[in-house]
Swiss-Prot record:
Annotated PROSITE patterns: RECA_1, RECA_2, RECA_3
Organism per entry: Francisella tularensis subsp. novicida (strain U112)
Coiled coil (UniProt feature): none
Region feature Disordered, mapped onto this chain: 328-359
Gene label: recA
Cysteine pairs bridged by disulfides in the record: none
This protein's name: Protein RecA
Lineage: Bacteria, Pseudomonadati, Pseudomonadota, Gammaproteobacteria, Thiotrichales
Amino acid sequence: MSKEKALESALSQIEKQFGKGAIMRLGDQEAAHDIDVIPSGIIALDVALGIGGYPKGRIIEIYGHESSGKTTLTLLAIAQCQKQGGTAAFVDAEHALDPKYAKLLGVDVDNLIVSQPDTGEQALEIADMLVRSGGVDIVVIDSVAALTPKAEIEGDMGDSHMGLQARLMSQALRKLTANIKRSNTLVIFINQIRMKIGVMFGNPETTTGGNALKFYSSVRLEVKKGGSIKDGIDVSGNEIKVKVVKNKVAPPFKQADFELIYGEGISLEAELIDLGAKYNIIEKSGAWYSYKGKKIGQGKEKSKEYLKENTAERDEIERAILELLLPNKYPNKDSNDSPKEGSKIKTKVNPAVTQDELI
């Protein structure tokens, strides 16, 4: 029997025993397809992720220091999922979800599925059941640090429980991974940072829950606070920096910078001004910003106010930025080709280099 016939016989036997689709060539029509995504709700982050959003059927880890904007990122993703007609679930192990803030970010709180589990085992079992149902598009677990093993809860304060949480996460992720891929569900774990004791060289920071999540995650995002945004003498928000430290679906190590305004969420207008000026969609001369030869404001704050009031121009600028930076997802209406130097939208950055250093 030739090699080809032996292989076809083996493939046929595998399909017969385990079902159609259990094994296939990567070039087969059933296997070859673009990755489905859920937009992050932040243009700069969609670009940094390389595919226009979070990949479905994968595990994502978002980690960072306290009050750095981790939960905000997940709520924005939930809002985007719901806008597309999807169903979202939030496993609130920290018991700290603020419905008012979620609503402010665009989340349909009436249709958001929420669970506040008592133990880590219960939280992960609920997440697994939601994933296996196939009826949920995104599941957020907030947070890994709050997934307390049952043995620790039932034990006395001060008892030592070495490695319990790491074992729990390792076991759960082994079980979850195949179901997540099969149901094409996006699962986001929020994680916290801890300090490793006795580290003299290198980064002493690490995440909770052992190493399993680091391996199983297709994308890992590190969230950091930047400088303060001031309205006069009052602090009205923070600059946020998100670094893609691991990415299995696109080139990693890109960074997204944006503004988080207290009580409002992410400032879309600030993002459009920054990206528009960077790629010459918005002209900047001194302190003045202009769009298509028309001055829109002196200074960033005035320009933000203008875009808030003039939604048609804001949407036009947003579309131009998306067509330039994510041409595969948002094709140019005027041309099938990606914008080049000297075209209608001119860029200061060489397009060949752009995809490696966009943000």
